[in-house]
């Protein structure tokens, strides 16, 4: 029996995750990456320098450069990849036990909304990737890897739609991503778990409305 579209999408994410071994990352490097993401998400990417990062960590510049010889550019690249792989791994954990396509879609959306609303680093990731399309400050290899992850993420949604019998277009999927990526801006989260759960449910309802509005015809018609 052939794997379902969802199973194929999940398998592609597992293959993507297997390409990098983050277990080998030293505690010192992880600490620097976490601090960079936190500072950049709070104060803005341009406000973070090797000096401000060192001050945040209580480290001298030589200690930072011993972990990241190429300086801030290397830290930016590795922090983006580290966040990407963490997001992908946690997303896979959140959806892979879903019993049906509808539940899988809902799990995708709930995770996406929760990340965007409660994790400032997710908004930073979107900002840096969007800014790179204009300014081109990320390296080509990094740009391609991030774009590849975006395509895998979109394919998870496409797979769910296909199993629900909906012939979805890429334009519709991108419209849904625009909605979900902007969750921090339309949610007005009050910081409580109950409100976050309500917001994720709302995200599911909005995404299904967009999905159905953008569907050309039922796949089985």
Roles of regions detected by a PLM:
Residues 28-36, 53, 75, 79-87, ...:
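Generic hydrophobic, amphipathic alpha-helix propensity
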Residues 104, 116-140, 185-188:
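Amphipathic alpha-helical segments used for helix-helix packing
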Residues 114-119, 159, 166, 173-194, ...:
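Amphipathic C-terminal alpha-helical segment
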Residues 92-119, 173-176:
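Hydrophobic alpha-helical connector segments
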Residues 1-26, 215-221:
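N-terminal intrinsically disordered/low-complexity leader segments
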Residues 20, 31, 39-74, 78:
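Helix-turn-helix
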Residues 85-88, 92, 126, 135-163, ...:
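Amphipathic alpha-helical packing segments from all-alpha helical-bundle domains
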Residues 19-20, 79-105:
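Amphipathic alpha-helical linker/stalk segments
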């Amino acid at each position: 029996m052939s794997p379902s579209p969802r199973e194929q999408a999940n398998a592609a994410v597992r293959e993507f995750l297997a390409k990098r071994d983050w277990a080998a990352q030293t505690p010192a490097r992880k600490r620097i990456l976490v601090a960079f993401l936190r500072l950049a998400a709070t104060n803005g990417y341009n406000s973070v320098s090797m000096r401000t990062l060192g001050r945040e960590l209580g480290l001298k510049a030589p200690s930072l450069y011993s972990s990241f010889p190429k300086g801030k550019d290397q830290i930016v690249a590795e922090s983006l990849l580290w966040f990407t792989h963490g997001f992908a791994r946690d997303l896979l954990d959140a959806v892979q036990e879903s019993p049906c396509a509808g539940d899988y879609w809902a799990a995708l959306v709930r995770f996406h909304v929760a990340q965007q609303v409660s994790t400032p680093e997710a908004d930073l990731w979107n900002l840096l990737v969007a800014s790179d399309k204009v300014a081109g400050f990320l390296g080509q290899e990094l740009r391609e890897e991030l774009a590849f992850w975006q395509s895998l993420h979109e394919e998870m949604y496409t797979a769910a739609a296909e199993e629900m019998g909906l012939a979805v277009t890429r334009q519709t999927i991108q419209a849904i991503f625009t909605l979900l990526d902007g969750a921090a801006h339309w949610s007005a989260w009050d910081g409580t778990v109950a409100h976050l759960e309500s917001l994720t449910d709302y995200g599911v309802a909005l995404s299904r409305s967009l999905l159905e509005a953008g569907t050309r015809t039922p796949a089985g018609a």
